[in-house]
Amino acid sequence: MSSGKIAQVIGPVVDVLFAAGEKLPEINNALVVYKNDERKTKIVLEVALELGDGMVRTIAMESTDGLTRGMEVLDTGRPISVPVGKETLGRVFNVLGDTIDLEAPFTEDAERQPIHKKAPTFDELSTSSEILETGIKVIDLLAPYLKGGKVGLFGGAGVGKTVLIQELIHNIAQEHGGISVFAGVGERTREGNDLYWEMKESGVIEKTAMVFGQMNEPPGARMRVALTGLTIAEYFRDVEGQDVLLFIDNIFRFTQAGSEVSALLGRMPSAVGYQPTLATEMGQLQERITSTKKGSVTSIQAIYVPADDYTDPAPATAFAHLDSTTNLERKLVQLGIYPAVDPLASSSRALAPEIVGEEHYAVAAEVKRVLQRYHELQDIIAILGMDELSDEEKTLVARARRIQFFLSQNFNVAEQFTGQPGSYVPVAETVRGFKEILDGKYDHLPEDAFRGVGSIEDVIAKAEKMGF
């Protein structure tokens, strides 16, 4: 095990000098610095660059407070390695695989795997055309998710990405009954804490491994924590042949941390100040999140859109890797429609008649057509009023508004805030409900009866309460 000395510390970047004759560590190797003689507390560094003359530049995975020039640094001879397997279920980790849930730490002989690996080869990959039911109407009808597929939840600040991902965990993890991995990447510690206790109370935690690298942690930890979660998921897929759910909140923070690290390493920034290696880093992560012949990984990723600008390089780079996109829209939040999913901007390659069936496809296409026409008529309505529309257009607008409200529903995870119980709506119920609205069966019911309800039966019950 070769050793070197700290030459300089610049925030989370640490330069280490190895004497002549010492073997230089490889890129991505983990180095260890002990903060005191008892060797109880250590800081892990990851090699990022080799500068020449025995000098390597590393990124710290923890705060560098207390490090000084001249301290000894040991090369572990391998990348950061984290615990994998059944022992990880029900536990909470940091980027290094250390437990942070105040329960017993892992033993030294626990199975570990390196977080840096190659993506599966082309001949190992497998695709599926089976739909993953979420119980959320707008998703199941207009942008359905594939088992073993990749889903992106796009949205600006405060439009409901984390609440939506928590509802998906609640619905899918409980219905799915398989193994789930949650990676909290650069998000609020409070949200992670809330999620942990909710999962503990519901019992889902027993089949879930959670990995956190939150906002307050150094960029190195935020950049690598997604790989830690992915490594745990890959083990269940490849070794145990499981169908795994991987939730990542938030992929943008992975890019943001990479941007910070890139600047600290002295690389020239690219478009909008992002790292020049943005597409490569995103590709290396996303290509590992895939389904193979041994098992599948269905990933649901929240993706923050800076200033609601979808042309920003970070969300634009992530777009290319996804099967389904669920776009959240601020205008719908302002209308009080939750989840604020934009039915026209969201898309899925699963919305095809050979996958969802002819009826589902036809209903979804007609819903989109009606909403698109309503969108086009809104300018006329704003300037001239409803009176200038033909009778046919007035009927279309009335149905479009009912559809828009019926696409909303109450969430189980938001019950403590709204006071309304959440609802899980099967796909068949969703398709039937929208088909009947399109056929004009409920034109006599008030628009408000369609807001924040589950199935079409709930609409009828709500209308009866309102006196209709």
UniProtKB/Swiss-Prot annotation:
Catalytic activity as recorded in UniProt: ATP + H2O + 4 H(+)(in) = ADP + phosphate + 5 H(+)(out)
Subcellular location as annotated: Cell membrane
Pfam families per the UniProt record, alphabetical: ATP-synt_ab (PF00006), ATP-synt_ab_N (PF02874), ATP-synt_VA_C (PF22919)
SMART domains per record: AAA
Chief location bin: membrane
Coiled coil in keyword set: no
Sorted UniProt keywords: ATP synthesis, ATP-binding, Cell membrane, CF(1), Hydrogen ion transport, Ion transport, Membrane, Nucleotide-binding, Translocase, Transport
GO cellular component terms attached to this protein's record: plasma membrane; proton-transporting ATP synthase complex
An annotated Gene Ontology molecular function: ATP binding
PANTHER family, per the entry: ATP SYNTHASE, ATP SYNTHASE SUBUNIT BETA, MITOCHONDRIAL
Family of this protein: Belongs to the ATPase alpha/beta chains family.
Name of the protein this chain belongs to: ATP synthase subunit beta
Origin species: Streptococcus pneumoniae (strain ATCC BAA-255 / R6)
